[in-house]
Design a protein with these regions (language model features):
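Cell-envelope/extracellular polymer assembly enzymes that use nucleotide-activated donors
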Residues: 21-23, 49, 192
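Short, well-formed alpha-helical segments that are part of the catalytic scaffolds
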Residues: 30-44
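Donor nucleotide-sugar binding loop of glycosyltransferases
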Residues: 31-34, 57, 80, 107
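A conserved acidic beta->alpha catalytic loop
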Residues: 54-62
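Acceptor/aglycone-binding surface of glycosyltransferases and processive sugar-polymer synthases
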Residues: 76-78, 82-90, 108-187, 213-230, ...
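Short beta-strand-to-loop acidic/aromatic patch adjacent to the donor-nucleotide binding site
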Residues: 94-105
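Catalytic donor-sugar/metal-binding loop of nucleotide-sugar-dependent glycosyltransferases
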Residues: 161, 185, 195-212
Length: 254
Protein backbone atom coordinates (compact mmCIF):
# COMPACT_ATOMS: atom_id res chain seq x y z
CA UNK A 1 0.00 0.00 0.00
CA UNK A 2 1.41 3.38 -0.95
CA UNK A 3 2.56 5.52 1.96
CA UNK A 4 0.85 8.91 2.03
CA UNK A 5 2.82 10.49 4.84
CA UNK A 6 6.33 10.12 6.14
CA UNK A 7 7.70 10.51 9.65
CA UNK A 8 6.14 11.21 13.00
CA UNK A 9 3.77 14.06 13.69
CA UNK A 10 5.53 17.28 14.64
CA UNK A 11 4.80 18.57 18.16
CA UNK A 12 2.98 21.90 18.21
CA UNK A 13 2.09 22.41 21.83
CA UNK A 14 -1.05 20.31 21.82
CA UNK A 15 -0.86 18.98 25.40
CA UNK A 16 1.54 18.08 28.18
CA UNK A 17 1.94 14.45 27.16
CA UNK A 18 2.89 14.31 23.49
CA UNK A 19 2.77 17.84 22.09
CA UNK A 20 0.16 16.82 19.51
CA UNK A 21 -3.43 18.03 19.46
CA UNK A 22 -5.76 15.07 20.04
CA UNK A 23 -9.55 15.34 19.83
CA UNK A 24 -11.73 12.52 21.16
CA UNK A 25 -15.25 12.10 19.77
CA UNK A 26 -17.79 10.02 21.70
CA UNK A 27 -21.26 9.37 20.19
CA UNK A 28 -23.90 8.73 22.87
CA UNK A 29 -27.54 7.78 23.26
CA UNK A 30 -28.73 7.11 26.80
CA UNK A 31 -25.31 6.25 28.23
CA UNK A 32 -25.76 7.87 31.66
CA UNK A 33 -24.62 4.67 33.38
CA UNK A 34 -21.33 4.60 31.53
CA UNK A 35 -20.31 8.04 30.27
CA UNK A 36 -18.81 9.13 33.60
CA UNK A 37 -16.42 6.17 33.67
CA UNK A 38 -15.50 6.66 30.02
CA UNK A 39 -14.59 10.31 30.53
CA UNK A 40 -12.81 9.69 33.84
CA UNK A 41 -10.56 7.04 32.29
CA UNK A 42 -9.37 9.14 29.34
CA UNK A 43 -5.69 10.06 29.91
CA UNK A 44 -5.97 13.81 30.42
CA UNK A 45 -2.32 14.40 29.54
CA UNK A 46 -2.92 13.05 26.02
CA UNK A 47 -6.24 14.67 25.15
CA UNK A 48 -6.74 18.25 23.96
CA UNK A 49 -10.54 18.19 23.71
CA UNK A 50 -13.39 15.74 24.27
CA UNK A 51 -16.57 16.08 22.22
CA UNK A 52 -19.65 14.11 23.22
CA UNK A 53 -22.19 14.01 20.39
CA UNK A 54 -25.52 13.12 21.92
CA UNK A 55 -28.51 11.82 20.01
CA UNK A 56 -31.75 12.46 21.88
CA UNK A 57 -30.76 10.98 25.24
CA UNK A 58 -33.50 11.03 27.86
CA UNK A 59 -31.45 9.82 30.84
CA UNK A 60 -29.30 12.88 31.52
CA UNK A 61 -26.25 11.79 29.55
CA UNK A 62 -25.49 15.31 28.20
CA UNK A 63 -25.57 16.90 31.68
CA UNK A 64 -23.27 14.25 33.10
CA UNK A 65 -20.82 14.73 30.23
CA UNK A 66 -20.77 18.50 30.72
CA UNK A 67 -20.10 18.09 34.44
CA UNK A 68 -17.10 15.94 33.51
CA UNK A 69 -15.72 18.73 31.33
CA UNK A 70 -16.68 17.46 27.88
CA UNK A 71 -18.05 19.65 25.13
CA UNK A 72 -21.54 18.37 24.33
CA UNK A 73 -23.13 18.75 20.90
CA UNK A 74 -26.75 17.78 20.37
CA UNK A 75 -27.36 15.84 17.14
CA UNK A 76 -31.08 15.07 16.84
CA UNK A 77 -30.68 13.23 13.55
CA UNK A 78 -30.19 9.51 13.98
CA UNK A 79 -27.18 7.54 12.80
CA UNK A 80 -23.84 6.49 14.29
CA UNK A 81 -21.90 7.85 11.35
CA UNK A 82 -23.79 11.13 11.48
CA UNK A 83 -22.79 11.58 15.12
CA UNK A 84 -19.14 10.92 14.29
CA UNK A 85 -19.23 13.35 11.37
CA UNK A 86 -20.89 16.02 13.50
CA UNK A 87 -18.17 15.62 16.09
CA UNK A 88 -15.46 15.78 13.44
CA UNK A 89 -16.92 18.98 12.02
CA UNK A 90 -16.75 20.61 15.45
CA UNK A 91 -13.15 19.78 16.35
CA UNK A 92 -10.75 22.65 16.95
CA UNK A 93 -7.83 22.12 14.58
CA UNK A 94 -6.57 18.75 15.89
CA UNK A 95 -3.68 16.69 14.56
CA UNK A 96 -5.35 13.38 15.43
CA UNK A 97 -9.00 12.47 15.97
CA UNK A 98 -10.01 9.49 18.11
CA UNK A 99 -13.43 7.83 18.00
CA UNK A 100 -14.65 5.96 21.06
CA UNK A 101 -18.01 4.56 22.14
CA UNK A 102 -19.65 5.84 25.30
CA UNK A 103 -20.67 2.47 26.77
CA UNK A 104 -17.36 1.55 28.46
CA UNK A 105 -16.90 -1.63 26.42
CA UNK A 106 -13.58 -0.28 25.17
CA UNK A 107 -11.04 0.95 27.69
CA UNK A 108 -10.26 4.68 27.32
CA UNK A 109 -7.06 4.10 29.28
CA UNK A 110 -5.73 2.26 26.20
CA UNK A 111 -5.71 5.48 24.20
CA UNK A 112 -1.87 5.38 23.97
CA UNK A 113 -2.13 2.05 22.12
CA UNK A 114 -4.44 3.60 19.51
CA UNK A 115 -2.34 6.75 19.15
CA UNK A 116 1.13 5.21 18.99
CA UNK A 117 1.22 4.13 15.30
CA UNK A 118 0.08 7.59 14.17
CA UNK A 119 2.27 9.59 16.54
CA UNK A 120 5.30 7.51 15.54
CA UNK A 121 4.61 8.02 11.84
CA UNK A 122 3.76 4.38 11.06
CA UNK A 123 0.08 4.88 10.24
CA UNK A 124 -2.48 7.35 8.96
CA UNK A 125 -5.41 5.43 10.45
CA UNK A 126 -5.33 3.09 13.45
CA UNK A 127 -8.01 0.47 14.11
CA UNK A 128 -8.53 -1.22 17.46
CA UNK A 129 -9.12 -4.96 17.11
CA UNK A 130 -11.17 -6.62 19.82
CA UNK A 131 -9.91 -10.08 18.88
CA UNK A 132 -6.30 -9.84 19.99
CA UNK A 133 -6.29 -8.04 23.33
CA UNK A 134 -7.40 -8.86 26.86
CA UNK A 135 -11.04 -9.14 25.88
CA UNK A 136 -13.88 -10.75 27.78
CA UNK A 137 -15.34 -13.49 25.53
CA UNK A 138 -18.83 -12.58 26.73
CA UNK A 139 -18.48 -9.04 25.39
CA UNK A 140 -18.96 -10.08 21.76
CA UNK A 141 -21.84 -12.53 21.16
CA UNK A 142 -21.07 -15.23 18.60
CA UNK A 143 -23.27 -13.62 15.95
CA UNK A 144 -21.57 -10.24 16.34
CA UNK A 145 -18.12 -11.81 16.27
CA UNK A 146 -18.98 -13.83 13.16
CA UNK A 147 -20.40 -10.79 11.36
CA UNK A 148 -17.32 -8.71 12.11
CA UNK A 149 -14.92 -11.42 10.97
CA UNK A 150 -16.91 -11.97 7.77
CA UNK A 151 -16.88 -8.26 6.91
CA UNK A 152 -13.20 -7.95 7.78
CA UNK A 153 -12.40 -10.94 5.58
CA UNK A 154 -14.22 -9.38 2.65
CA UNK A 155 -12.26 -6.15 3.13
CA UNK A 156 -8.99 -8.11 3.15
CA UNK A 157 -10.02 -9.91 -0.03
CA UNK A 158 -11.20 -6.87 -1.98
CA UNK A 159 -8.83 -4.18 -0.70
CA UNK A 160 -5.79 -5.94 0.70
CA UNK A 161 -6.06 -4.33 4.14
CA UNK A 162 -4.86 -6.50 7.02
CA UNK A 163 -7.84 -6.03 9.30
CA UNK A 164 -9.59 -8.50 11.60
CA UNK A 165 -12.31 -6.32 13.13
CA UNK A 166 -14.50 -3.28 12.47
CA UNK A 167 -14.48 -2.04 16.05
CA UNK A 168 -15.42 1.50 17.09
CA UNK A 169 -12.18 2.38 18.93
CA UNK A 170 -10.04 3.98 16.22
CA UNK A 171 -8.07 7.08 15.30
CA UNK A 172 -6.99 8.97 12.22
CA UNK A 173 -4.85 11.89 11.23
CA UNK A 174 -7.18 14.86 10.94
CA UNK A 175 -5.92 15.80 7.47
CA UNK A 176 -6.48 12.24 6.26
CA UNK A 177 -10.03 12.10 7.61
CA UNK A 178 -10.84 15.37 5.89
CA UNK A 179 -9.34 14.11 2.62
CA UNK A 180 -11.52 11.00 2.70
CA UNK A 181 -14.69 13.12 2.56
CA UNK A 182 -16.60 10.69 4.78
CA UNK A 183 -20.37 10.93 4.42
CA UNK A 184 -21.97 7.68 5.61
CA UNK A 185 -24.55 8.52 8.30
CA UNK A 186 -25.15 4.98 9.59
CA UNK A 187 -22.95 2.34 11.21
CA UNK A 188 -21.60 1.73 7.69
CA UNK A 189 -19.38 4.72 8.47
CA UNK A 190 -16.84 2.38 10.06
CA UNK A 191 -16.48 0.52 6.77
CA UNK A 192 -16.38 3.70 4.71
CA UNK A 193 -13.32 4.95 6.59
CA UNK A 194 -11.39 1.72 6.01
CA UNK A 195 -12.37 1.24 2.39
CA UNK A 196 -11.85 4.84 1.29
CA UNK A 197 -8.56 4.89 3.17
CA UNK A 198 -7.43 1.74 1.38
CA UNK A 199 -8.45 3.03 -2.05
CA UNK A 200 -6.55 6.28 -1.43
CA UNK A 201 -3.43 4.41 -0.38
CA UNK A 202 -3.29 5.56 3.22
CA UNK A 203 -1.50 3.43 5.80
CA UNK A 204 -4.00 1.51 7.93
CA UNK A 205 -2.60 -0.27 10.99
CA UNK A 206 -4.51 -2.52 13.37
CA UNK A 207 -3.63 -2.82 17.06
CA UNK A 208 -5.07 -5.08 19.74
CA UNK A 209 -7.33 -3.51 22.36
CA UNK A 210 -9.32 -4.87 25.28
CA UNK A 211 -13.08 -5.29 25.08
CA UNK A 212 -15.61 -5.93 27.83
CA UNK A 213 -19.39 -6.24 28.15
CA UNK A 214 -20.93 -2.83 27.65
CA UNK A 215 -22.80 -1.02 30.39
CA UNK A 216 -26.45 -0.97 29.32
CA UNK A 217 -28.20 -2.50 26.32
CA UNK A 218 -26.74 -2.43 22.81
CA UNK A 219 -28.66 -0.27 20.32
CA UNK A 220 -27.60 -2.32 17.28
CA UNK A 221 -26.17 -5.76 17.85
CA UNK A 222 -27.75 -7.05 21.04
CA UNK A 223 -29.87 -9.60 19.16
CA UNK A 224 -29.27 -12.04 16.33
CA UNK A 225 -31.84 -10.21 14.21
CA UNK A 226 -30.15 -6.86 14.82
CA UNK A 227 -26.73 -8.28 14.01
CA UNK A 228 -27.91 -9.93 10.78
CA UNK A 229 -29.44 -6.66 9.62
CA UNK A 230 -26.30 -4.70 10.47
CA UNK A 231 -24.03 -7.29 8.85
CA UNK A 232 -26.05 -7.34 5.62
CA UNK A 233 -25.93 -3.56 5.41
CA UNK A 234 -22.18 -3.43 6.07
CA UNK A 235 -21.38 -6.19 3.56
CA UNK A 236 -23.42 -4.40 0.90
CA UNK A 237 -21.44 -1.22 1.56
CA UNK A 238 -18.13 -3.06 1.19
CA UNK A 239 -19.17 -4.47 -2.19
CA UNK A 240 -20.64 -1.15 -3.33
CA UNK A 241 -17.37 0.70 -2.73
CA UNK A 242 -15.51 -2.05 -4.56
CA UNK A 243 -17.72 -1.61 -7.62
CA UNK A 244 -17.20 2.16 -7.53
CA UNK A 245 -13.45 2.20 -6.93
CA UNK A 246 -12.52 2.37 -10.63
CA UNK A 247 -14.91 5.18 -11.46
CA UNK A 248 -13.59 7.84 -9.11
CA UNK A 249 -10.54 8.39 -6.94
CA UNK A 250 -10.44 9.66 -3.38
CA UNK A 251 -8.63 13.00 -2.90
CA UNK A 252 -5.37 13.00 -0.96
CA UNK A 253 -3.87 15.73 1.16
CA UNK A 254 -1.16 17.84 -0.50
Amino acid sequence: MRCSHGGALRPRGGNEGIGVRVSVIIPTHNEAQAIGRVLADLPSNLVTEVIVVDSNSTDGTPDLARKMGAQVIQEPRRGYGRACLTGLANTQNPDVVVFLDGDYSDRPSELPIILAPIIEGRADITLGSRFGGKSNPAALPWHQSFGNRLAAGLIRLLYGVKVSDLGPFRAGRADVLRALALEEATYGWAVEMIVKGAIAGFRIVEVSVSYYPRIGKSKISGTVKGTVGAAWFILSRIVRYSLRRRRAGTPRPA
